[in-house]
């Protein structure tokens, strides 16, 4: 049985816009552009027959999922393993950082494994954060670079094998301060 997975990052937040690096340290909310991005993502997802959404419990991911799916009958299930890494994640020596990278990846991969094993739906969306979305793609065999706000990656799982199908970008250009040349 083919199963479709749609991994997407939350829409732009004020903190993204300001160029802040905040990970899971604070609760951030979508900007007007972030809301517009989520609506565009919803247009892309509208014919994908999404049956369930798994989400980071952080408001920006839930808010993006609610807007994009736009259907109160579709359950949004939060999972703490879909939270972005903390800001202090990159501090320490190389061995400490590598261990945290491995632990973080294994946490995210175990979440995906549990969804695959326990959820019988065929069209599943996962709303999270840039680093988490990148790790999900990597767990499916695709190495992605920077993940933009509301960018979505479509994978098919068929007979235990992952296939990358396509990706969606909202086309809404936002200027995050961290994206500007120094």
Language-model features, listed with the residues they occupy:
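Active-site loop/turn elements of alpha/beta-hydrolase fold enzymes
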Residues: 10, 81-82
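Acidic, low-complexity terminal tails and accessory targeting/binding regions
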Residues: 2-3, 44, 77-78, 84-96, ...
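GST superfamily/GST-like fold recognition
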Residues: 130-134
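Beta-strand elements within well-structured catalytic alpha/beta cores of enzymes
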Residues: 4-8, 122-128
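Active-site-proximal alpha-helix that buttresses catalytic centers in soluble enzyme cores
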Residues: 2-3, 8-72, 101, 147
């Amino acid at each position: 049985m083919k199963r479709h997975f749609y991994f997407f990052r939350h829409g732009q937040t004020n903190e993204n816009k300001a160029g802040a690096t905040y990970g899971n340290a604070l609760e951030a909310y979508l900007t007007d552009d972030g809301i517009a991005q989520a609506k565009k993502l919803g247009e892309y997802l509208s014919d994908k027959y999404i049956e369930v959404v798994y989400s980071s419990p952080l408001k920006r991911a839930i808010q993006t999922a609610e807007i994009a799916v736009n259907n109160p009958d579709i359950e949004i299930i939060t999972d703490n393993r879909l939270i972005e890494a903390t800001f202090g994640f990159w501090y320490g020596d190389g061995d400490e950082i590598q261990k945290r990278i491995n632990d973080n990846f294994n946490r995210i991969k175990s979440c995906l494994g549990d969804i695959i094993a326990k959820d019988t739906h065929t069209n599943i969306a996962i709303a999270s954060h840039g680093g988490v979305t990148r790790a999900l793609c990597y767990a499916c065999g695709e190495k992605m670079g920077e993940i933009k706000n509301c960018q979505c990656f479509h994978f098919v799982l068929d007979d235990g094998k992952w296939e990358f199908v396509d990706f969606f970008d909202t086309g809404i250009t936002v200027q995050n301060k961290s994206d500007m040349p120094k």
